[in-house]
Amino acid sequence: MAIGLEHYLTVAAILFTLGIFGIFLNRKNVIVILMSIELMLLAVNINLVAFSTHLGDLAGQVFALFVLTVAAAEAAIGLAILVVFFRNRGSIAVEDINMMKG
């Protein structure tokens, strides 16, 4: 039995749904929200690679590499901001971040 396109799409849909549930069910911790967003980006990348392979076009795979690069940079910058915020405020709760004043 070969693994077809529908298997990849099913896995990607499950990962995307888990990411959405992670955002909606845990609104108190910023790190969990960032991890859920990364899980959703991973699901999108799986879709890009699956469709790219199915259609025989490399554009989707190249675009997935760019998305992974940007997602890694976004995660690094987001975590660095959270570390600085935790050092200054002592908490990374979403309520505390919403109270920031410019």
Curated annotation (Swiss-Prot):
GO terms for molecular function: NADH:ubiquinone reductase (non-electrogenic) activity; quinone binding. It is found in: Cell inner membrane. It is a multi-pass membrane protein. It catalyses: a quinone + NADH + 5 H(+)(in) = a quinol + NAD(+) + 4 H(+)(out). Its main location: membrane. Gene3D superfamilies: 1.10.287.3510. One of its GO terms (cellular component) is NADH dehydrogenase complex. It holds the Pfam family Oxidored_q2. InterPro entries: NADH_UbQ_OxRdtase_chain4L/K (IPR001133), NUOK/Mnh_C1-like (IPR039428). Keywords: Cell inner membrane, Cell membrane, Membrane, NAD, Quinone, Translocase, Transmembrane, Transmembrane helix, Transport, Ubiquinone. Its EC number is 7.1.1.-. The chain crosses the membrane at residues 5-25, 31-51, 66-86. GO terms for biological process: ATP synthesis coupled electron transport. Belongs to the complex I subunit 4L family. NDH-1 shuttles electrons from NADH, via FMN and iron-sulfur (Fe-S) centers, to quinones in the respiratory chain. The immediate electron acceptor for the enzyme in this species is believed to be ubiquinone. Couples the redox reaction to proton translocation (for every two electrons transferred, four hydrogen ions are translocated across the cytoplasmic membrane), and thus conserves the redox energy in a proton gradient. NDH-1 is composed of 14 different subunits. Subunits NuoA, H, J, K, L, M, N constitute the membrane sector of the complex. This is NADH-quinone oxidoreductase subunit K. It comes from Parvibaculum lavamentivorans (strain DS-1 / DSM 13023 / NCIMB 13966). The lineage of its organism: Bacteria, Pseudomonadati, Pseudomonadota, Alphaproteobacteria, Hyphomicrobiales. The gene is nuoK.
